[in-house]
């Protein structure tokens, strides 16, 4: 089974899980770990304890809120130090939904394609992609002649 840990600063991960539950119903394979402002326990300890409760054959994904953030950096380091999971930085709801619903592990090129697909959800719906890709037209500057107007 795929186990998804949403890891964020503040309440973002809990809010994302709430959204997943609204769409999917029970999401017992989605878990939340948050870094609170006054937290004394390192987030890495929380994740290690959570992973210890999973089955040995589960595939674990830790989806973090921001690339380069303390949460993300701690998860990357933890994954390099022997705890087996895949880190995906900058998660969004479509990515989390797809991983939560997948009956099989998503790895390699398939995971890369899923991440690219999730990026397509980040758009300005009021400006079609074609318009955004087109070069902007330069406005013509008004011509002013120096001196008083000629009659």
PLM features per residue range, with description:
Residues 1-61, 67-151:
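N-terminal loops that bind phosphate or other acidic moieties
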């Amino acid at each position: 089974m795929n186990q998804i840990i949403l890891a964020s600063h503040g309440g973002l991960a809990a809010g994302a899980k709430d959204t997943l539950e609204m769409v999917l119903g029970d999401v017992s394979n989605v878990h939340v770990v948050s870094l609170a402002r006054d937290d004394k326990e390192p987030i890495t300890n929380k994740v290690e304890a959570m992973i210890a409760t999973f089955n040995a054959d589960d595939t674990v994904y830790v989806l973090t809120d921001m690339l380069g953030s303390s949460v993300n950096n701690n998860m990357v380091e933890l994954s390099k130090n022997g705890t087996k999971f895949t880190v995906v930085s900058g998660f969004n709801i479509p990515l989390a939904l797809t991983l939560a619903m997948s009956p099989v592990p998503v790895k390699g090129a398939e995971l890369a394609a899923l991440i690219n697909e999730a990026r397509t959800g980040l758009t300005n719906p009021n400006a079609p992609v074609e318009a955004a890709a087109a070069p902007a037209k330069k406005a013509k500057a008004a011509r002013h002649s120096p001196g008083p107007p000629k009659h």
